[in-house]
């Protein structure tokens, strides 16, 4: 099904003379779509179908095993992308294994919202305004972040 979508998007973008970058995603690892012993082969097979359909890159969500990463990267015909995941080695090591892009995924907002929830609970419990000035950015720093 995804192949048909990729083909349609590629065909439409080509017809409109739009240089579109298509990053195909699979959740073989994230959702354990096949038994563990079959995941590498299934992932490689999906990559082959997606590249034939017109995908430019391949994102494998939930992939953290270095042996699997290296095997997949060496067998597919497009760049391999992974997301930050528990147990995943640092970006430099991933590059040596063949990974071309490391995404933060939902890690940054998940971490941020954990801190927000903890701060809100402490503030509601204590009513201490000092909490709002500890470890925070100034208004000027915030403005600078959002001024491009």
Language-model segments: residues:
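Extended, intrinsically disordered, low-complexity segments
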Residues: 11-12, 107-148
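Alpha/beta enzyme core
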Residues: 1-104, 110-118
